[in-house]
């Protein structure tokens, strides 16, 4: 019997997580951590409904990825079950390295290390725990797999990440301009020469998608009030980092202290991946 976990999502309805590798990924503490990370950071000061999390977004992107894989298969694009599982695992973990407050921590108390870099490090850490079961997912995430359209579904101009966050952020903020027709866009996807393409009759839907994304940046992501709050937070963190560098004892959670009292750069971060980092 096919066993699965069913999750009721307010944006897409029921999401099926099959028992096995994908279910183990969803249950992993590093992915569950995203339940405590708001998707839109400080945007809730402007849009009080924007309380949704990176975990919800990851599940939504997984749902869209499953739909996209099924749609591409119906058009004669052969995708092995192992490839489908791997790309679904990759999209589940694509934001696993995200910190709180959206992108505020990048290039502030963490220098030159993007959340994608941290996501990859954490994926490799989980892969070791799972005895290499995520090797193919990591290859797809790093764009090292021959079928490049799989990576483009995870990270590209028309990936499942963007299709979910526009719908989800629109839903929770109430800004209707982001409510794109994701189902229609997915139906228009195809593959040519191992690259993701769109059928000509889907161009209008893509134009709407691009317009919706631009409007969401204007109205939500770059809203002057939330940006001002982010600037104040960045100034506070940089000042705290400066005081920490002088050996001053600061009142902070163990997790924040780790970043304040250690220099985290792209080069140094590799040596920290074996540590059990504080989670509170």
Feature annotation, model-predicted:
Residues 78-91, 136, 140-144, 148-149, ...:
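Alpha-helical scaffolds flanking conserved acidic
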Residues 60-65, 114-127:
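An active-site-proximal "capping" alpha-helix that borders the catalytic cofactor pocket
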Residues 46-86:
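Alpha-helical phosphate/pyrophosphate-handling elements in metalloenzyme active cores
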Residues 206-259:
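A conserved active-site cap/scaffold subdomain adjacent to cofactor or substrate pockets
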Residues 125-215, 222-225:
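Histidine/acidic-rich helix-loop-helix segments that form or flank divalent-metal centers
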Residues 61, 83-103, 119, 233:
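His-Asp-centered metal-binding catalytic motifs of divalent-metal-dependent phosphohydrolases/nucleases
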Residues 273-279:
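Conserved small/polar residues in nucleotide/adenosyl-binding loops
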Residues 25, 33-59, 106, 147-149, ...:
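Active-site flanking loop/helix segments enriched in acidic
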């Amino acid at each position: 019997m096919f066993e699965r976990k069913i999750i009721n999502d307010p944006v897409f309805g029921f999401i099926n997580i099959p028992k096995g590798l994908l279910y183990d990924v969803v249950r992993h503490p590093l992915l569950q951590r995203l339940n405590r990370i708001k998707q839109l950071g400080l945007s809730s000061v402007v849009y009080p409904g924007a309380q949704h999390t990176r975990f919800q977004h990851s599940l939504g992107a997984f749902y869209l990825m499953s739909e996209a894989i099924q749609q591409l298969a119906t058009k004669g694009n052969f995708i092995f079950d192992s490839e489908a599982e791997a790309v679904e695992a990759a999209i589940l973990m694509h934001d696993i390295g995200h910190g709180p407050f959206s992108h505020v921590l990048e290039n502030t108390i963490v220098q030159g290390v993007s959340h994608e870099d941290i996501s990859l490090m954490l994926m490799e850490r989980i892969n070791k725990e799972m005895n290499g079961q995520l090797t193919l997912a990591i290859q797809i995430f790093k764009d090292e797999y021959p079928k490049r359209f799989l990576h483009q579904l995870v990270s590209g101009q028309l990936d499942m990440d963007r299709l979910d966050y526009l719908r989800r952020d629109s839903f929770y903020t109430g800004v209707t301009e982001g409510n794109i027709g994701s189902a229609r866009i997915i139906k228009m996807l195809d593959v040519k020469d191992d690259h993701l393409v769109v059928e000509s009759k889907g161009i209008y839907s893509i134009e709407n998608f691009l317009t919706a994304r631009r409007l969401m940046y204007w109205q939500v992501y770059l809203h002057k009030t939330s940006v001002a709050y982010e600037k104040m937070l960045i100034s506070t963190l940089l000042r705290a980092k400066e005081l920490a560098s002088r050996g001053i004892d600061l009142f902070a959670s163990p997790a924040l202290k780790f970043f304040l009292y250690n220099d985290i750069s792209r080069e140094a971060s590799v040596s920290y991946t074996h540590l059990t980092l504080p989670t509170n």
